[in-house]
Amino acid sequence: MPNQHMLLLSNLLPVGLNISTWWNFGSMLLTCLALQITTGFFLAIHYTANINLAFSSIIHITRDVPHGWIMQNLHATGASMFFICIYIHIARGLYYGSYLNKGVWLSGTILLITLMATAFFGYVLPWGQMSFWAATVITNLLTAVPYLGTPLTTWLWGGFSINDPTLTRFFALHLILPFAIISLSSIHIILLHNEGSSNPLGXNSDIDKIPFHPYHSHKDALMLTILITLLFIILSFTPNIFNDPENFSKANPLVTPQHIKPEWYFLFAYGILRSIPNKLGGTLALILSVTILLTVPFTHTSYVRSMTFRPLAQLMFWTLIATFMTITWAATKPVEPPFTIIGQTTSILYFSFFIINPLLGWLENKIMITH
């Protein structure tokens, strides 16, 4: 009888035979989310959301709390792993045309925005130098909004500068947003299972499906093992590899760091913001760097879903990946030549992908019809 139930359960989720390892990142993201919520809960128990005590409470967690250093480092490194997985997940969606499942893609983009907001609020909490100044710079962008900018910024800060009320509300938001992420993830997964996964060929999977368990579940288990092993290797040997040296000093509003920059996973957006000399223009470009993903399902022109059989589109896709990495690198450098021109060039290339790709689809259609 139990075997019958197991058979029924495994056959309830038939999955395309040929989906590759790139399809495993969804389950890895779910694992990252569970890890972040668990470690975050234990950190929240010992954390104090007060500008005089926040920095000391982090030191207290790492030094005095039993296994606190593991929790703190897992939470910080886990965030980087989360973003590595989500960027690969999005790249796979762009390459294999998964965005044509509109509900899944749009809910996923909203998930990305929520995740970025959560990570930003979390970066402010240790109240180190870079935490404070990154929060000052990013929240100050709200002042670029015509008419409403200044009152909006004052409302967000809870005063006329970043102070105790700001830290308290950022902690509250950092605590509540992961639950919004859980809800959005549930919607994302429900919408996915409504239509089913795409596959590397972009063809219909209905003709050849296999049970999710044991085939794909074992593939998931392998990738999760690699993820957790990598996480613990970083944790054991280079736990501060993703941290900024400035953040080991307590926040000082009177001393500005030589080069203010956010965490590495925001550097591509920060690089785009920095490459436009106008404040409002830069803010709009920053917002557009993520929200432009919402347009992708509506600008798909090719008859072929996946890029597997589209060499011209592949060229543009890999240019986008190289561009993304170059912007990230350029944003770590000071605002001076040649980094300014590199930032501006790569920003133009980044947005050009979303304009050129539909044109390439149209061109490929023409070539296919004539041949």
Curated annotation (Swiss-Prot):
It comes from the Eukaryota. Heme 1 (or BL or b562) is low-potential and absorbs at about 562 nm, and heme 2 (or BH or b566) is high-potential and absorbs at about 566 nm. The gene is MT-CYB. GO terms for biological process: mitochondrial electron transport, ubiquinol to cytochrome c. A ubiquinone binds at H193. Heme b b562 binds at H75, H174. PANTHER family: CYTOCHROME B (PTHR19271:SF16). It is found in: Mitochondrion inner membrane. GO terms for cellular component: mitochondrial inner membrane; respiratory chain complex III. This is Cytochrome b. It is a multi-pass membrane protein. Belongs to the cytochrome b family. Component of the ubiquinol-cytochrome c reductase complex (complex III or cytochrome b-c1 complex) that is part of the mitochondrial respiratory chain. The b-c1 complex mediates electron transfer from ubiquinol to cytochrome c. Contributes to the generation of a proton gradient across the mitochondrial membrane that is then used for ATP synthesis. One of its GO terms (molecular function) is ubiquinol-cytochrome-c reductase activity. The chain crosses the membrane at residues 25-45, 69-90, 105-125, 170-190, 218-238, 280-300, 312-332, 339-358. Binds 2 heme b groups non-covalently. Heme b b566 binds at H89, H188.
